[in-house]
Structures are given as structure tokens and as C-alpha cells.
């Protein structure tokens, strides 16, 4: 219905709607109401592929009944992020902060964390399974490190995995724990210089192909949408 929107976005059309998703069940809900799925769980590309298939299978079915005035058919995945030419240094700069973010989110949801009283970071450090140096050693021993924390080549493979799995966008988590501002800026600069360009070059063609493929499904979904009747002036919420 009509309502007073605060703050008032300048963008026209209005910014697309997204829903935070943490598991397959919430992915299904997002697709069924035609909103973007912001996957706030740190999953690997194989699990991401399963989520993308679930999401787009529903978008392309009668089960999609849009809640808004448009369908935002997109899936975004949150990812860890720390880039350095030295893989070990990337881990030292970003791994602990990323792990702490995951720990803190779980603690705030699953436990009664009290501001100014709970000792989340100290508790996290006591419970941490492996040190940075142990993770560095394991990473060096691995045949492949497609990861958001590593060298430009590592993160390139990481993004390629999500792209090939059907993920539309990747959101990099950076400001967490004791991650330093200058390290975050250095990671972003290196990413922009050595990785981002090749993916940006693909965007227009990939988005056009996707839009053409989804157009009949989105048109059918909008035709199923039950539209509300206009409210009398005295019933418009303010």
C-alpha cells in the first residue's frame, strides 16, 4: 500500500529487494517471493551450486509469486577476503578476523551476549582450533587454495568457483576482529589491480544472457502476483 518511505532513495526504480539467507530453507523462501538471496553463510562453491540450483529452479517455476513490484533474481555470497602476493602474509592479516566474525555472529544469535560484559574476542581466542601458522602450513601442503584469503591467483580461482556454480555476486568481508585498515586498503588495491578487471569484462555479456533467459519466467511470475487494491486516504499508514 501507499506509505511514507524513510529515508527516500534517489534511485529510480527503487533499489531491488534482498533477503538474508543462512540455509537452503531460506533460499527457497527468497526465490518463492522473487527477491534476491543474500547468502550470509560461508559455504564452498559446491554447496553454493546446490543453493543456486534450488534458487533458480524456483524462480523458473509457478512457485515464484513476487512480493514486490519487480523480481530481483540474484544470488550473492558473502566471502572471506585478504589478498597479498605472499600467501602466508594474507593469512596472517585476514584469517583471525574472518574466523572471529563467524564466531561472533553465532555467539550473538545462539547465546545471550551482553554489551560491555561479554568477552567475545577473548572467548574466541580460547576456542580457536588452529593458529595462523598451522593454517599457513596446511595451506602450503594443499594442492590448491581457491580461497578468499591468499594470493591474487588464489582469489581468482575462488571467484571462478562461485561464478561457475551460478552465483551472481560475491561480497567480501573485510572489517572484522583486529583486521587493520591499511591491510584492508592494500588488499582492495591489489585485487583491483590484478583480479577484478577480468571479471568486470564479463559482466555485460553475462548479465544480458541471463536477462534474456529469465525474461519469460519473470514475466510469468509477475502475472501471478496478487496486486493490492488502492487504500482510501484515511487508511494510508504514516
Would you name each region that the model predicts?
Residues 1-6, 46-167, 196, 200-238:
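An alpha-helical appendage that flanks or caps ligand/catalytic pockets
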Residues 9-16, 142:
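A local structural motif
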Residues 17-20, 35-40, 73-80, 170-172:
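Hydrophobic faces of well-ordered beta-strands that scaffold small-molecule active sites
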Residues 22-53:
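A conserved active-site cap/scaffold subdomain adjacent to cofactor or substrate pockets
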Residues 26-27, 48, 85-86, 179-181:
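Short catalytic/ligand-binding loop motif for oxyanion handling, primarily in non-cytosolic enzymes
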Residues 42-45, 172-188:
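Glycine-rich, proline-tolerant flexible connector loops at the mouths of alpha/beta enzymes
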